[in-house]
Amino acid sequence: MIKSALLVLEDGTQFHGRAIGATGSAVGEVVFNTSMTGYQEILTDPSYSRQIVTLTYPHIGNVGTNKADEESSQVHAQGLVIRDLPLIASNFRNTEDLSSYLKRHNIVAIADIDTRKLTRLLREKGAQNGCIIAGDSPDAKLALEKAKAFPGLNGMDLAKEVTTAETYRWTQGSWTLKDGLPEAKSEDDLPFHVVAYDFGAKRNILRMLVDRGCRLTVVPAQTSAEEVLKMNPDGIFLSNGPGDPAPCDYAITAIQKFLETDIPLFGICLGHQLLALASGAKTVKMKFGHHGGNHPVKDMDRNVVMITAQNHGFAVDEDSLPANLRVTHKSLFDGTLQGIHRTDKPAFSFQGHPEASPGPHDAAPLFDHFIELIEQYRQSAK
C-alpha cells in the first residue's frame, strides 16, 4: 500500500508526497545536491550526517543499488527528497532497488514533490531545518515542531560521532569496470605509510591513496598527535566529515603539533577547514553550501578551471588567512576559498572532493602532489 509523506521546513512551507523509504520521521538540515548520478554514494557519505538531502535531478533510482558503491558501512544522510522514483531499476550491477535499500537502512524518504520549487527556496532563503514524516496520516503540526526544535549544524561537532571506533589498516585500491573491487594489496607493495584521520572518511579517498602506493593506518578522530607520531608516518591525511569544524579542538590541537614537524599533511573538505583553523584562519557557515558534481573551481597556480565534486556547508574565511597560508583554489560560483597551501610547511588542503564518487576527477592530481611531498620528505630524512 502506498503511504503518504510530508516535508515541512522551519519556515512553515509544506511539501506533500509519497513515502518511498521507512515509516517514521527524519529531522535535519535540508540541503540540495545537483549531481545527476551517484545517489548511493551520497547517501552513504558520512559528511551528510544530520542532513536531509534533496536531489535536484528528476529521476533517482534508475540503476538501483549495490554493495560496491557504498562510501561507508551505513547510510548517514538523515533523509532523502526526490522528484520521481522509477518503477524499474535496471543495471547490470543492481542488486536492490532504491526503495528497498532505504527501508532496509531505516531511512525516511519522500518522492513526488516539486524539487525545483524546494531548491529555489533553499537557494534564496538558505539551508533550512526540516522534518519528513512518512506514514498513514502525517501530522504537519508535529513536523513543524520537530523542524523548529532541531538546533542546526552551527557549533555541532559530528566528526567524533561518525568516526571509526578502532584503528584499522586499509590496503584496497579502486574499483574497475573489468575487475570490480580488487583484493587488498600486500603492504610490501605499498611503500608509503600514511596515517589517515577518520573524521567521516569516504572509502574512495582511501582507495585513491592506495592506488598511489600508500598503506593506510586509519585512526579515530580524537587520536592524539603523540600516538600518530609513534607510528612513524611518511604522511598524514585529514579526511572529510560532517558538521562544524570549529568545535573540533582535539583535531586542531593535533594538527598544530604535526605542523611543528616536516611530515606532509593533506586535508580534504573538513580536513581542509581544520588545517586552516590550526594555522590561525577562521571558518564561516555558508548560506546554502556547495553540494554537487558540477562546481567550477579555478586552480590559481596553473591558471586552469576544474569541474569538481563539492559537499560542504562551511568555508574558510579568506580574509582571515595568516601570512603563511596562500590561496591555491577558488570557487567560480561564489568566489569562496577552495584550496590553501602552507608556505613554510609541506601542508595543503582542498575544500572539494578530488576523489569524486560521485563526480569528475579533474582535481585527482592533488593526490599526486601529496605523494610528491612524501617522496621529498623521505629523501630529506635519509
From Swiss-Prot:
Residues 193-380 form the Glutamine amidotransferase type-1 domain. Pathway: Amino-acid biosynthesis; L-arginine biosynthesis; carbamoyl phosphate from bicarbonate: step 1/1; Pyrimidine metabolism; UMP biosynthesis via de novo pathway; (S)-dihydroorotate from bicarbonate: step 1/3. Residues 1-189 are annotated as: CPSase. It is an enzyme of class 6 (ligase). Pfam families: CPSase_sm_chain, GATase. PROSITE patterns: GATASE_TYPE_1 (PS51273). Composed of two chains; the small (or glutamine) chain promotes the hydrolysis of glutamine to ammonia, which is used by the large (or ammonia) chain to synthesize carbamoyl phosphate. Tetramer of heterodimers (alpha,beta)4. Belongs to the CarA family. This is Carbamoyl phosphate synthase small chain. It comes from Salmonella typhimurium (strain LT2 / SGSC1412 / ATCC 700720).
